A protein has these predicted regions:
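Catalytic NTP-binding/metal-coordinating core of nucleotidyl cyclase/transferase enzymes
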Residues: 1-88
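Short glycine-aspartate micro-motif
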Residues: 14-16, 113-115, 162
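Alpha-helix/helix-capping structural signal
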Residues: 20, 24, 121-123, 166
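Glycine-rich, phosphate-binding/catalytic loops in enzymes
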Residues: 31-34, 134-136, 179-180, 194
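A contiguous pocket-lining binding segment that forms or flanks enzyme active sites
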Residues: 138, 142-151
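Intrinsically disordered, glycine/charged-rich C-terminal tails and inter-domain linkers
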Residues: 1-4, 151-214
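Catalytic core of nucleotidyl cyclases, primarily class III adenylyl/guanylyl cyclases
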Residues: 53-81, 99-137
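Acidic, metal/cofactor-coordinating or nucleic-acid-engaging core segments within structured domains
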Residues: 47-50, 81, 85-102, 154-160
Length: 214
């Protein structure tokens, strides 16, 4: 199934996600000279995302980042559908990783899964080298949130998201994530170095108990 590009204008929800332990996984497969399972895995993930564009919520698969994607959702996306998309993606990844990638690794990575950063804001379209590109603070914030998901954790966990308070209040406040916690993070070059208040969402059970680190 082919993916569809979606034209984004004005406000948009930016979802950044990547694969945990990707550097170790790539190194493992490279050492064994067997990188085909990784390309096959990413090809399957691309097809899954194309299917979800029609089945769950339309979005623009804006950019592949080497170990994840930047996805752009229209501002009028339904919050329940957006949450379902994130949860379904976690389920797909967990099953497919165990089925098609893990058997080819020499050892199981310490942390398996995906992590997300989500923000909303104005995106400015531009053409660069003949390609549709976007600039906007929301892209920077979503990427920083994704990178900061596991900061301050005593025991890192995957299948979680850091979402800005704006995204939470506009899209997720009336939904039912498995678990939500108020947290703060220091995001590089965001908020002038001040603490950035956000929410952490657990998207796949089992999750950490309430007395574990935020």
């Amino acid at each position: 199934m082919d993916y569809q590009r979606l034209t984004i204008s004005g406000q948009a929800i930016v979802v950044a996600f990547d694969m945990c332990s990707s550097s170790n996984i790539i190194e493992d497969l490279t050492k064994s000279r067997n990188v085909q399972p990784l390309t096959t895995f990413y090809g399957g993930l691309k097809r899954y995302l194309a299917k979800e564009q029609k089945a769950t919520a339309p979005f623009d698969p804006y950019k592949f980042t080497g170990d994840g994607w930047l996805l752009l959702f229209p501002a009028n996306t339904d919050g329940a559908r957006l949450l379902r998309f994130l949860e379904n993606l976690c389920l797909y990844f967990a099953v497919e990783f165990r089925r098609s990638l893990l058997p080819h690794l020499s050892h199981r990575p310490a942390l398996v899964g995906i992590r997300f950063g989500v923000d909303k804001g104005e995106l400015i379209p531009l053409t660069m080298y003949g390609q549709q590109e976007y600039v906007g603070r929301a892209i920077n914030v979503a990427c920083r949130l994704q990178a900061a998901v596991m900061d301050r954790e005593r025991r890192p966990t995957a299948y979680t998201a850091l979402v800005s308070n704006r995204v939470y209040s506009e899209y997720f406040a009336e939904t039912k994530p498995h678990r939500v916690v108020k947290v703060t993070r220091n995001l590089r070059n965001i908020n002038g170095g001040a603490e950035f208040a956000c929410r952490r969402l657990w998207l796949l059970r089992p999750y950490l108990s309430t007395d574990d680190a935020n």
